[in-house]
């Protein structure tokens, strides 16, 4: 995916486990969050958490200690929380299975191979499998 194609006047990108404050005592972190710049205005930015929903949430694998939940259960719960908070699209890239899960509100969630195009937003697509193959990665 070519991040340079994302209009940085229209969108704000937060990464590296950026925090979201869903409600009291309910905070989540995201690998990559894409906000509409009209939603995440400068007065909504602080040191801890964004309290407005991103337009897109992108996650790579489940990288938390799962005491009593399966990986699938954790993904489902987190995805439901994000969609309930107002996120328009949640995308999970899963390296072990080489799959991508895409969830949007009011629609069936999709699971596809990661060598298929995935629209992130505004016609910008990501194809992890193709990218890795082009780079000669053994993980393609």
What are these regions (language model features)?
Residues 1-12, 16-140:
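C-terminal interaction segment
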């Amino acid at each position: 995916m070519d991040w340079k194609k994302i209009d940085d006047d229209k969108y704000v990108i937060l990464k590296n486990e950026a925090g979201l404050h869903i409600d009291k005592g309910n905070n989540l972190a995201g690998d990559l969050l894409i906000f509409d710049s009209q939603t995440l205005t400068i007065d909504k930015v602080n040191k801890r958490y964004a309290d407005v929903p991103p337009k897109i949430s992108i996650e790579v694998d489940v990288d938390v200690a799962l005491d009593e939940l399966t990986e699938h259960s954790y993904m489902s719960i987190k995805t439901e929380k994000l969609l309930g908070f107002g996120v328009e699209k949640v995308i999970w890239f899963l390296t072990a299975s080489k799959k991508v899960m895409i969830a949007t509100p009011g629609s069936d969630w999709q699971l596809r191979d990661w060598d298929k195009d995935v629209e992130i937003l505004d016609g910008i697509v990501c194809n992890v499998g193709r990218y890795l193959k082009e780079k000669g990665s053994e993980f393609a």
